[in-house]
Amino acid sequence: MSVFTFGHGSNGALGLGKITDDTCPTPQKVNYFTEIDKRVKKVACGSYHTVFVTDDEHLYICGIKKDPKHGTTLFYTSPPPTTTTTTTTTSSTSATTTTTNGMVNEKNNNNKNNNGEKIVNSKPESVIIKDGASNTTNDSTSSSSTSTSSLSSSLPPTNIETPRDKKKPPIKLDKGIPHHRSTRELIQRPESPLLNKLLTSKAEMEFKHYESNEKSKDEMKDNENENEEDEDDDDDDSTIRQNEDKESSLIDDNESETSLRINKKDAENITNNIRLIKELDEQQQQPQQPQQNLKGIMNQPPLPTNDDLDEDPNIHFTPIRISTHFLENSPLNTIKQVALGNYHIVLLTEGGNVWTWGSNSNGQLGYLVDTQQQQQQQLQQQQSMSSLQPSASSSSPSSSSLQTTCTPKMVEIKCVKYIATGVKNTAALTEWGELYMWGINEHGELGLGDTIDRRTPTRVIRLKNEVVSTIACSSTHSACYTESGKMYVWGQSDETGKIQAIPSPLPIHSYLDREIKSPNGGGVGGFFGGGGKIKQLACGQRCIAVLTQMGEVFMWEIPGIPIPLRNALENHSVRNIVMGNFHLVCLTDSGEVVTIGRNKTGQLGRTDAENEPGIVKQLSFDPDGLNSDEFVVSIAAGEFHSVALVENTPKTKLALQLVRMQRNYLRQLNILNNIYYKSMMSMASPYDPVVLSMMNNGSASTLPPSLKGLSGGLPDNANNTIKNGKDKDNHHNGDSNGHHSNGHYHGNGNNGNNSITTSNSISSPSLLGSGGTLKSRSASIATIRGLFGINHMLHHSQSQSFQEENSTVTEDEIKEIFSDIEALSKLTEKFLSYLDQRMDNWDPVSKVLGDIFLDEALMAAYRIYIPYSDSYNTSCMTLFNIRRRNERLSNIIKDCEKKSKSFGVKLDQEFVKEIDLKSLLLSPLQNIPRIYILLRELGSDDSGNINPRDIDLINFAATKFQVLLERMNQNFQFVNAVEILHCSSNEYGNPQIMGGSLPQLVDKLTHHNISDPNFRDVFLLTFRAFTTPCNLFDLLVETFQRQKHLKNGRVVNVITSWVVHHFYDFEKDKLSDFTQDPNHNPQLLSEKLEQFIYSEDHQSVSQIKLQYFSHRKRLESSINLIDNQKLTQNEITTPPPLQIQNNNQNNNLENNNNNNNNNNTTTTTTTPNDNINDINNNNNNNNNNNNNNNNNNNNNNNNNNNNNNNNNLTNSTIKLVVQPPIPINFNLLDSQPIEVAQTLTIMDHHYFAMIDKREFLGQRWAKNKSPNIQISTDHFNRTSQVVVTEILKSKNSKQRSATLGYFISVAYCCFELNNLSGTASIIYGLNSASIQRLKKSWSKLPKESMIAFEYLDKIVTPMKNYISLRHLMTTIQPPCVPFLGTYLKDLTFIEEGNPSIIGGLINFYKQRKIAEVIFQIQQHQQVVYSAIRSNPTIKAFLMSSHTFDDKQAQKISSEAE
C-alpha cells in the first residue's frame, strides 16, 4: 500500500520531506513508509497536518510542530522520564551511565528506532536515589511539552536506578518499539569545570537525610503514586506502566543501604540549575546548536533528528511516530477513525471511545483543563526561563499565552460511531443516532441555539427526535442527515455573516431528483437527478457537498440550491468525497480520483493552470498513472492539500468491485421505481370490473359506425374486425378479408390460414400487435375512400379518443409488472450500506467481509428473489398485453427510456447493455449470480492477505447463494444457473442467451433443458459469422457421442433443422457462387454428413437421413425439369441476373445449384418484360400460394418456411413465359388509381420476397454481394422515375396538376394496401427537385389532395430516422410490403455498433439483434397478397416504359415552368 500527497507543502503536511517549492501540483509518493516497511491503512488531514495509521496501529503525524498562538502541539509528549542509572567513579576516570533525563530527552526522543522511525515517545518515571536512607519519588504532574528535569548524577558512591531495574532484567526491545540511545554517549562530553563543580559540591549541600517511620513513608509514597497512574511509561518495554504504589520499601535485600528521599521542591531547583548550567556550558563549546537546546527549555515539543540540515525546526516535513500507549488498556482499542482540526486531533476507537489532544483554546478537546495544575506548570516554566539570556527569552511566547499541550485523554462520551471536526470544534455521533458537539461556537456551528463555546460534549437538543446518520463540520457551519431522510444545516448562512444557531431543515430530496433545465433558459429539460438517500456529507468554506447512495454528487454554496456535478465528474459513480477549504476530492467506484475547485496550491493534483474539474491522471489507469494492479482505496483533504491511499491487494479489489456492482444495480432498481413505475401509474385507472370486462370482451359490434369498415375502397359490410384487448384468436376466426368491390380487390385482408400466430412467431411480437395496422393506421386515414374521403380525416381525434377509452390499463396491472421492486430496492440499500461502512474502515488483513452475507435478517430478506423469479414471466406477459392494447402506454414507455438515459449517474456498461424496461426487469435475476461468482473468487484467493476465518465465512455464504440461485433457475432451466448473466429478455419474459464461447453455445444448443425457444433458429441463421459449417458439424458430432447414453435426440434435432432450413450449406447455389464465400464448402460438409449417417446405428439418425435425401431428390427432379424444357422461337428469354422465378406448381422442388447447373441453363440478355412475366405467373397461381402458406403455418419455424418463399435463388426453377406487348396508345393515367396500386403492390412484394435471408448478413448489400436487394432497390427507383416522367410529359400546368393528384391517389391506395414501399417510392418521386419546383402546378392542386400528400409525406419522411414509418412497420399486420431502407439501416447500425467479441466471448446478443430484423422481414415475405390481382398491361408499362434520368427531368422541368 502506498500514500500519495499533493498540494501545499511548505507546512510539511505532505510528508515528502523538505521540498524545493511551496506546492506539489502532482501526486508524489511518501517514501517514508516504504523505507521503514510499514503499511498505511488510514489517512486523515487537518489544516496543517496529515495523520497516518499503519496496520500495526501506530500513529504518525507530519506538519507544523506547534500552534504559534497558544504554543500547543499535536506531537505530544507525556512528561519526560527522569530516570537515572548507576554512576561509577574510579581513581583515574569517572565512568557514568545515565538514562534519559529532562535535558537529554529532547535529543533522545528524536532518535530513530531500529526501523528508522522518528518517534516522539516519553513516559514519566519516579526518581529513586539509593544511599542507605529513605527513598524519594519525583513525579511530574504537568501534561505539557515541558520536560521536568531530574537529577542527572550524584556523589560518587551514590547509585541511581529505577524501581523496575530492581524488579526485572531489561526486556529485549521489539522491532517496532523505539529504543533510547546510550546515555553514556550523551554524558561523555568535553570537561566542564563549572558543571563538575556543581555536580560534586551542590548536591552535598542541598540533599538532606530524612528519618521517619514506615507509615509516613508509605503515605507520602501513596500520594505521589496517585498522580502517576495516568502517566505513560517510557521504559524500553512500552507495555509496562508504572504501578509502584504497592512498593512500601525499595531497600535492596542484598545490600544494607538507606534510601534518601529528595525534597520535591529542592530536587526541582537542583535539576533546573543543573540543566541551565549545562546548557550554558554546551553553548560555549558547541555554539552552532544553541537554538535547539534553547527551545527544549521553552516548552517546545522535542525535535526529531533529521538528515536534512536545512529543515525548518518548527516543521516536521516527514512523519513522526506518536506513542499510542494510552490505548493499551482500552477495550477494542483499534483505531477506527481520526479527525483533525487546526491544532487538535480526535481519535475514535472500535470500542466507541473518543480520545483528544492538542489545542483546547475553545474547548475543542471536550474536557476542562485543571487550572491549578496549568498555573503551576506555567510558573515553573517562567522560573526556568527567568535565568536565560534576553535573546533566548525574547523568542518564547509570553507567559499569558502559554498553554500546555494536553496528553491524550478520553472524552466523557461512550458508544460513538462517527466523529467530525471543524477548525476549532468537534462533533460525535453515537450508535443511537444522538449528536453531540463541543468547541468554538462563534457562528452558531454547534447548533445549540446560541454562540457560547462548549468545553464538554453537549447534545444538540433540536435533533433529539431524529436519528442522525452522518455529520460534517467546517469553520463556520455544520450539516447532518437523518435516517428519516431529512437534512439539517446550521451556522453561518450567507456571505454577510448571518447566523442560524439552530439546525434548520433543508428539503434536499426535492433537489436530488428534479429536472435540471438547460443553461439557455429555454425550458427544455437537460437531465434529472438520480435521487436516493444521502451517504456522505462534506463541508468547506461556505460550501456543502453531498454524496447519494446512488453514487451521485451534489454541491452548492451557502446560500444556494444543490446542483449535480454529473458533467464535472464525467458520469462517474462516486464512492467517497472529502472537501478542503475550496476544493472537492471524489473517489469513484472504479478507483479513480476526480478533483474539483481551486488549484492555486496544486491541491487538485493537476498541472492545469485553470480550475477545471478532471481526473488525476497519476492516480488513474492512465499510462502515466498507477500500475495495472493498483487502485485508490481512500482519500483525505486538508485545507490546501490532498492525500490518496493506494492499494493492490486482490481481496480489496474484489470487495470494491462488489460495491460498484451493487451500486449500479441499485440505480437500475431506482430507474424502475422512480421513472417507469411512477410514469405508468400516472396514466393507469383504478380497477373497474365493468370497464375491464368491456375491454377484454370488446368486438367490432361495440364500436361506433365511424370505425367500421375502415379500409378505403371496401364496402360497409367488409368483415375487417378490429382486435381489442386480449382477443388473441380473433385473426384466426374471421373469414377471408379480400373482397371484390367495383371490380377492385383490396389487399388489407388475408385468408385466416395465412396469418402468423403469436405462438409460432420467431420475430418480435410487436409486429403481431392485436391493434395492428387496421387499428392504429386506419384510425389515422381509414375514412379516406381512395381520393375522395380526405375531408373525413377530422374524425381521427374522436376515433382515437374512443379507442383509448376501450384500452384502459388498471393500477393492479401496473403493480403486477413491478411487484417486489420496492422491496428489492430497500434490501439493496441495506446491503450496500453494510458494504460501504465496512469499506470505509477497511483493512484486508484484519477485517472480515463474509459475516455481512451471513446476517440472518439480510439472508431472510433475500428470499424475495424467489417469488420475483416465479412471477417474472407473468409480469413480462402482462406488460406485453397492455402495450398491445394501449398505444398511449407504449408512448409513455418510450419516453421513460429516453428519460432513463439522463437520470442520475449513467449506468455502468460493464453490467448493463440495455436500459429498456424488459432488460431492467431482468436485472434482479442477474444480480444473484453476480454476487455468487464474486464470492467464489473471494473464497479462492490464495494470496495470503485474507483472514482464514473470513475465507470460511465467504465460502459458506457462497454456498447459500448457490442454493438460492438454483431455486431461481427452476423457472428457467438453464444448463448452468449463471447463464442468465449472458441473457437478454424478450417481450414474453423468456431470458435469451447474450454471449459465450463457441463450445458453450453449442452445449446450450444441444441441451435438453433449453429455455430459449428461439436460440436454435438464431444460431443456425447467424453462426457463419463466428465459425464455419464444417467446424460446427464436428462439434455437433462430438456432442452426439457424449450424449448417446441420454437418448434425448437433441443433436439429431439440431442437424435435422439445419438440413431442412439451411440446405444451401450442403449444396452450391447461384447466390453462393455470386458471393464466393471462402468458408462455404458444401461438398466437404455433405461428405461428413453422409459418413455420420451411415456410421451411426442410432435410430434417431434416420430422421436426418430422411430429410437429407429427400432434399437431394428434389434437387435432382428440378434439374431434370430444367433439362426437359425446350425453348421455342416465340419465347422471350430470360429474367434479370440471378432473378429466379418461384415455380408455384412445383413448390416442393429445389434447383440443383452445382456448377453443372449453369451449363444446363440458357442465358441471354435481360429484358424488363421477363420480370413482368415472372410476376404475372406468380399471381396466376393463387391457389398454390395459399398451399404454400398453409405449409408455412404447419411449420413451427416460420422464419425459414422450407425455403419456398425466402430462398428463391435456391428453391426455384426458371419459368420462361411469353410477354404480351404494351398497347401503342396506352396511357397509365386512364387506369383506376386502385388498379395501378394493386399492380404495383404485387410487383413490390415479389421483389421484396425474392431477397434471400443470406443477403442480409454481413452487410453484403454494401459489398455488391446481394443481387436481389439490388434488384428491389432498382425497381423502387424506377417507380419514382415513372412518376416524374409522367408528370413532366404533361403539356401544361393544369394537366401536370391533375397528374400530381392522380399519383397522390395511387400513393393513398398503396398505403391502404399496406404497401409502404410503393407509397414511399411515389412520394419520393413527387418530392424530387424537378417536380417540387413546379409551383404553378402545385398551386392548382385541390385542397384535399394537398392534405393527403402532406399526410403521407410526414409518414415516409426520413426525419428522425423514419420515426413515423417505423411506428407503422412495428404495428402493421401482414400482408405488407415494408420499406426496405429502414431494415438495411438497422442492420448497418447493429453490425457497426456492436463488437463481435466481448471479453473473449462471442457477442451472441449482436447475432440475435440481426436475426430479429431478418425474422421481421421474413414474416412479411411469407404472407402474399392472394386477394388482389395485377393488370398485365400496367405491369408491362411500369417495367418497360421510357423514363427520364435526373438531368433530362431537370431540363424539361425548367422549360415547363
From Swiss-Prot:
Compositional bias ranges of the Basic and acidic residues kind: 171-188, 209-224, 238-249, 724-738
Gene Ontology CC terms, in alphabetical order: plasma membrane
Domain Ras-GEF: 1232-1454
Record field: compositional bias (Low complexity): 83-121, 134-158, 283-292, 376-403, 703-715, 739-762, 1142-1210
DH domain mapped to chain residues: 650-971
A molecular function (GO) term: guanyl-nucleotide exchange factor activity
UniProt xrefs under SMART domains: RasGEF (SM00147), RasGEFN (SM00229), RhoGEF (SM00325)
Family annotation (Pfam families): RasGEF, RasGEF_N, RCC1, RCC1_2, RhoGEF
GO BP term (any one): Ras protein signal transduction
Record protein name field: Ras guanine nucleotide exchange factor C
Organism listed in the record: Dictyostelium discoideum
